[in-house]
Amino acid sequence: MWIYLILMVALVIIDQVIKAAIVSHIALGASTSIVTGLLSLTNLHNNGAAWSILEGKMWFFYLISVIALIVMGYLLWRLRGKWLYEVGISLMIAGTLGNFIDRLRIGYVVDMFQLDFINFPIFNFADSCLTVGVIFILIGVLRDDSFEK
């Protein structure tokens, strides 16, 4: 269980360091191409969710974050010993914490990764942790034979 706590802390630190670097090196709204036509770094302040849904509804995000962290903490404890679930939930907790810290500390989430080849919301490292965490959990569900009984 300790390894997952270390993983979560490391991922939250990485998320916060990336966000601090973006804010200090890229002007708000500016963009820098990393791989032409593929990936740019942008400094975007997001006080909503993807596609700006629920923009400005911070109370909602605070509430959902706290509830999600409680539920995921319980599931992490309940599903201990099933490594795919443990990794997935740990990634999701780290992602939730990374964005929750932003909302509490500065009132918005810093997003930076822009996919230039598709119309997709700009996202951050914490969002990536959430997405990869969901993938681990889906793989765990597909491989878990206890659901077949």
From Swiss-Prot:
Please provide one cellular component term from the Gene Ontology annotations of this protein.
plasma membrane
One GO MF annotation is: aspartic-type endopeptidase activity
Name where it's found: Cell membrane
Q: Which InterPro entries match?
A: Peptidase_A8 (IPR001872)
Provide this UniProt record's keywords sorted from A to Z.
Aspartyl protease, Cell membrane, Hydrolase, Membrane, Protease, Transmembrane, Transmembrane helix
Q: EC annotation?
A: 3.4.23.36
Q: Which PROSITE patterns match?
A: SPASE_II
Q: Look up the record and give one Gene Ontology term from the biological process aspect.
A: proteolysis
The top EC class is hydrolase
Instruction: Locate the transmembrane regions by residue number.
Output: 24-44, 57-77, 81-101, 122-142
Q: Has keyword Protease? A: yes
**According to its UniProt record, which residues of this chain constitute the active site?**
D111, D127
PANTHER family reported in the protein's UniProt record:
LIPOPROTEIN SIGNAL PEPTIDASE (PTHR33695:SF1)
Give the family per the record.
Belongs to the peptidase A8 family.
- What this protein is called in its record is Lipoprotein signal peptidase
> What is the native source organism of this protein?
Lactiplantibacillus plantarum (strain ATCC BAA-793 / NCIMB 8826 / WCFS1)
The root-end lineage is:
Bacteria, Bacillati, Bacillota, Bacilli, Lactobacillales
What gene name does this entry carry? lspA
